[in-house]
């Protein structure tokens, strides 16, 4: 390496080490990272969960206290926060408080910065959780369900509360990463590798996660997003202007979804209702039950005493019943205004991404509760918070709540530039993979084949599964069986029997001997072994080549 190139590389390395951030931004980063790790690892209760939430909200309170806001922003922050607290106390549900906290946190925070944090932290949490489940290191949540003509199969949640949640968690990961893609807009879409490769990687990842979750709603969420994004981006590359009719159509998707979800269950009658209810797996019937039995309240109601079988899967109904009418109207109006504002902005890759996310969110929220509950998977709340501060910025002079605190908030601190280091590492890995493509591809492929063969030969040999009845969606005619601890211990030692989440001798269990269930488990094991071992081996080879090249350069 020439001395000039070495100096340039050293300067790049030095700039990647640290950068300056204000205390206000650091407080936001701490809040957001804690929430991402907490929800990315699937925590839903317990002392760790409660402590982490308390620390995250303390960081957020500090961020708001030391920031500058105009009078309108202060009034809005106080009003919606107080309302969210009242809703929480009325319903016992933290979901609306989580949503409002993310919205109000977005002052002076760039969208790309938030998506960078989300991409790195959510991915790390997602991989850690799924790997721990694949290696059988934790409690394995699942649903046994008859799907796609295969008979009863195991739908794995891989650490999350439900297989649908797993698929949505992965799609959230895709949202974060695709927003950060830097396309080559000078090329047609089908010739732009910087765009096509990330899209293809996301497709492969989606199919892999779907192999475990068999979540049609989660898959549809991804397909709606990627179809909308590719369509909008192709039109942009072709030089097509976004017409008024197109803008209106996009803007109307959200309110139509809201109206269908909240009024549809009580307006539709007879056969029309029965058909839609069957298509949506009784979700409209549950919405109708809540509306006709409990009605709508201003601040939401506590439904914690209801059976787990009577839950609201529709996000809009969830917000209306748990958050109350006031917060429901505020968020629905804010979302509609934000979507209309977004479609009026300059057409760019990021703008198309935002629209695709909003369209996907609007449709998926009809059948899944992720948008306004405690899952922290609604990425569009970031866009909503950014929008509200943008449109309110011209109204009044920004001042701190307490003047002396603003000096603390504006104080800059030098901290490690994690994103720059990550990008630098990724570029070095890509360079090594390209430079040593044959050994990297050869070793990776060989490792993948060996891993798959080992998994297929020495993997699942079970021909029967015994699972908790509560985790199985079967017909009522299925006969429950009960086992003592001693009997279960004997069954666990039998390689032909798979015991899933046994609790005690009073817990009803079901037995399954569907051949397709165990063929599918073999296929999953083989593909997972090939994927993780192959990719891991390739990355290790790249790292080894980087170390060897670095040693040569020093000499």
Task: State where each predicted segment sits.
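A membrane-periplasm/extracellular boundary helix in multi-pass inner-membrane enzymes
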Residues: 213, 233-274, 453-459
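Transmembrane alpha-helices of multi-pass inner-membrane enzymes
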Residues: 358, 362, 373-415, 532-546
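Membrane-interfacial helix-loop-helix modules of multi-pass inner-membrane proteins that assemble, modify
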Residues: 126-163, 486, 493, 502-507
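TM-adjacent membrane-interface loops and short helices in multi-pass inner/ER membrane proteins
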Residues: 278, 283-311, 325-328
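Hydrophobic transmembrane alpha-helices and their immediate junctions
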Residues: 325-362, 543
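Helix-loop-helix junctions and helix-breaking kinks within/between transmembrane helices
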Residues: 41-50, 89-96, 161-163, 194-233, ...
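Transmembrane alpha-helical segments and their membrane-water interfaces
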Residues: 83-126, 230, 235, 340-341
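Alpha-helical transmembrane segments of multi-pass inner-membrane proteins
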Residues: 119-137, 161-213, 220-223
């Amino acid at each position: 390496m020439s001395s000039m190139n070495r100096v340039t590389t050293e300067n790049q390395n030095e700039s990647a080490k640290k950068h300056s951030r204000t205390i206000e931004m650091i407080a936001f980063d701490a809040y957001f990272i804690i929430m991402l790790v907490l929800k990315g690892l699937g925590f839903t209760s317990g002392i760790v969960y409660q402590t982490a939430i308390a620390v995250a909200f303390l960081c957020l309170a500090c961020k708001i206290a030391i920031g500058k806001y105009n009078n309108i922003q202060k009034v809005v922050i106080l009003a919606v926060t107080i309302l969210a607290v009242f809703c929480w106390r009325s319903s016992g549900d933290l979901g609306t408080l989580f949503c409002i906290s993310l919205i109000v946190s977005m002052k002076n925070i760039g969208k790309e910065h938030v998506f960078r944090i989300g991409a790195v932290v959510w991915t790390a949490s997602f991989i850690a959780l799924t790997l721990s489940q694949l290696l059988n290191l934790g409690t394995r949540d699942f649903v046994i369900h008859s799907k796609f003509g295969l008979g009863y199969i195991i739908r794995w949640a891989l650490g999350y509360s439900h297989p649908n949640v797993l698929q949505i968690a992965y799609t959230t990961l895709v949202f974060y990463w695709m927003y950060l893609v830097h396309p080559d807009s000078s090329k047609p879409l089908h010739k732009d590798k910087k765009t096509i490769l990330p899209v293809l990687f996301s497709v492969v990842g989606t199919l892999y996660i779907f192999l475990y979750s068999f979540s049609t709603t989660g898959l549809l969420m991804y397909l709606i997003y990627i179809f909308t994004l590719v369509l909008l981006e192709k039109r942009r590359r072709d030089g097509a202007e976004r017409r008024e009719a197109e803008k209106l159509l996009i803007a109307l998707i959200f309110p139509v979804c809201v109206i269908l979800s909240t009024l549809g269950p009580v307006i539709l009658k007879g056969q029309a209702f029965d058909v839609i209810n069957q298509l949506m797996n009784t979700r409209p019937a549950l919405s109708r039950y809540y509306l006709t039995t409990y009605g709508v309240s201003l601040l939401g109601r506590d439904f914690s005493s209801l059976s787990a079988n009577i839950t609201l899967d529709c996000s809009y109904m969830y917000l209306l019943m748990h958050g109350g009418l006031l917060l429901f109207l505020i968020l629905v109006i804010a979302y509609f205004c934000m979507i209309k504002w977004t479609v009026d902005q300059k057409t760019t890759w990021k703008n198309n991404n935002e629209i695709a996310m909003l369209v996907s969110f609007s449709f998926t929220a009809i059948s899944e509760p992720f948008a306004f509950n405690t899952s922290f998977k609604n990425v569009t709340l970031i866009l909503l918070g950014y929008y509200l501060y943008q449109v309110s910025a011209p109204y009044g002079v920004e001042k701190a709540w307490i003047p002396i605190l603003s000096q603390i908030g504006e104080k800059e601190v030098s901290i490690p530039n994690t994103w720059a280091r990550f990008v630098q590492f990724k570029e070095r890995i890509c360079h090594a993979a390209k430079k040593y493509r044959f050994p990297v591809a050869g070793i990776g492929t060989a490792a993948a084949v060996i891993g798959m063969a080992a998994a297929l030969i020495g993997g699942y040999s079970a021909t029967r599964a015994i699972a908790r009845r509560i985790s199985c969606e079967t017909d009522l005619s299925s006969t429950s069986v009960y086992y003592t601890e001693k009997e279960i211990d004997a069954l666990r030692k039998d390689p032909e029997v798979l015991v899933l989440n046994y609790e005690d001798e009073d817990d009803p269990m079901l037995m399954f001997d569907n051949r397709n269930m165990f063929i599918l488990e073999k296929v999953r094991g083989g593909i997972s072994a090939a994927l993780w071992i192959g990719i891991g081996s390739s990355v290790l080879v790249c790292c080894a080549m980087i170390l060897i090249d670095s040693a040569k350069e020093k000499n």
